[in-house]
Design a protein with these regions (language model features):
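Short, compact, well-ordered microdomains
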Residues: 40-62
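N-terminal non-globular leader segments, chiefly Sec-dependent signal peptides
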Residues: 1-39
Length: 62
């Protein structure tokens, strides 16, 4: 299992982990956010959230 915290400044590191399942950052109310494609559809990733990749490569947000 891999865990990576999104800081708002580490998009390239997140992109390496998530590949094409992550969309480029966008800004909302002064905060950086990402959209992540999971098995349940797109999920927002906010600064401070953790992206988790399980042993089968499935992604989720905590």
């Amino acid at each position: 299992m891999k865990r990576l915290q999104y800081t708002g400044l580490n998009y390239e590191e997140v992109k390496q982990m998530c590949g094409d399942k992550i969309l480029a950052p966008y800004f909302c109310l002064g905060f950086s956010m990402l959209s992540l494609m999971t098995e349940d559809g797109f999920v927002s990733v906010n600064e401070g959230d953790y992206i988790v990749q399980d042993e089968k490569g499935r992604l989720s947000v905590e």
